[in-house]
């Protein structure tokens, strides 16, 4: 598909973006045949296939200037000094990606009713911005949607506009 896109003159190319949701849910042919034959073995070739596919994809998509967004699941790696999050599917995606953002959420409550989520985005890898920075966004379930003012108090405190004293903000 990318080769066909590249054959068109640049003026005729419409903007394109690839989205893969979710990398962890992809299956290999070996995995499918093992499931059909009722074998309960783990597919050890999946991460190699993913690594090879992303090696080719990043080259082709880079030539065509096509962005790609991939979602994937994470799991906690326990055993090191500090537990860390790791992506499933091997290391191929980690090396191919220019930006890796880990998303997590917690419930936003009004009394006992859950009215939305606080979504935390942490940059684990970035070629465009500082790594290991967090951003929190509030998302309401009702018509309000994303809260555009969430986090401005903390940002003003960091900028020196006011101080947080005993849970209150003083100018």
What residue ranges belong to the model's regions?
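Terminal-proximal interaction/regulatory segments of ATP-powered molecular machines
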Residues: 164-171
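Conserved inter-motif catalytic segment of the P-loop NTP-binding fold
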Residues: 1-52
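Phosphate-binding/switch region of NTP-binding enzymes
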Residues: 43-159
């Amino acid at each position: 598909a990318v080769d066909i896109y590249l054959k068109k003159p640049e003026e005729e190319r419409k903007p394109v973006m690839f989205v893969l949701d979710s990398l962890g849910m992809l299956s290999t042919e070996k995995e499918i045949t093992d499931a059909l034959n009722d074998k309960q073995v783990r597919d050890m070739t999946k991460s190699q296939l993913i690594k090879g596919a992303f090696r080719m994809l990043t080259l082709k998509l880079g030539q065509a200037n096509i962005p790609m967004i991939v979602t994937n699941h994470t799991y906690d790696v326990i055993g090191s000094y500090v537990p860390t999050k790791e992506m499933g599917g091997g290391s191929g995606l980690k090396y191919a990606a220019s930006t890796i953002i880990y998303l997590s959420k917690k419930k936003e409550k009004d009394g006992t009713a859950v009215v939305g989520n606080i979504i935390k985005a942490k940059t684990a890898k970035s070629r465009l911005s500082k790594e290991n920075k967090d951003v929190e966004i509030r998302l309401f379930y009702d018509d309000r949607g994303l809260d555009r003012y969430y986090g401005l108090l903390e940002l003003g405190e960091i900028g020196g506009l006011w101080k947080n004293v005993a849970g209150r903000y003083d100018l």
